Amino acid sequence: MSDTLQSLDQLGSLKVSAPDAPQHLKKVDKFNRAYATGKRKDAVARVWIKPGAGKVIVNTREVEVYFARPVLRMMIQQPLVAAARAGQYDVICTVAGGGLSGQAGAVRHGISKALTYFEPELRGVLKKGGFLTRDSRVVERKKYGKAKARRSFQFSKR
């Protein structure tokens, strides 16, 4: 850096060339679909999105049938709503492992990643919303000498 800074206010105006910065390109297959995998807890979702009418299919079933709770359906739609693309893409996904909540989180993560593959300019919006970050929280293991991960057996003084 040949430019010298006189104050911290000038730091924002300083431009650094980054030729090694990753270029986010459109990644679609021959059927004009973007594919991504999403993960949450023990669930893994394989997601394909393509331009369409906003239809969501999970494990060959409608989303209303597979995810009966409205909260889970809302969770799946969040990345599309945040990117202002609700009703513009058809989503087809297969999801396995974990429970319904983990599966909904995995589908949401997969939809977010697939959207960035289809439209790389949406990456900033989705990243700011936290949709591209893998939620790394998993169940804590049970320890020996304990009833559960942290719960101790009942203690008796006498």
Curated annotation (Swiss-Prot):
Species lineage: Bacteria, Pseudomonadati, Pseudomonadota, Alphaproteobacteria, Hyphomicrobiales
Gene Ontology biological-process annotations: translation
Alphabetical list of InterPro entries matching this protein: Ribosomal_Su5_D2-typ_SF (IPR020568), Ribosomal_uS9 (IPR000754), Ribosomal_uS9_bac/plastid (IPR023035), Ribosomal_uS9_CS (IPR020574), Ribsml_uS5_D2-typ_fold_subgr (IPR014721)
Query: Which Gene Ontology CC terms are recorded?
Result: cytosolic small ribosomal subunit
GO MF terms, alphabetically ordered: RNA binding; structural constituent of ribosome
- Name any one Pfam family assigned in the record: Ribosomal_S9
* Identification of the protein by name: Small ribosomal subunit protein uS9
Q: Which family does it belong to?
A: Belongs to the universal ribosomal protein uS9 family.
NCBIfam families membership: PRK00132.1
> Whose protein is this, by species?
Rhodopseudomonas palustris (strain BisA53)
* Keywords, ordered alphabetically: Ribonucleoprotein, Ribosomal protein
SUPFAM superfamilies hit by this protein? Ribosomal protein S5 domain 2-like
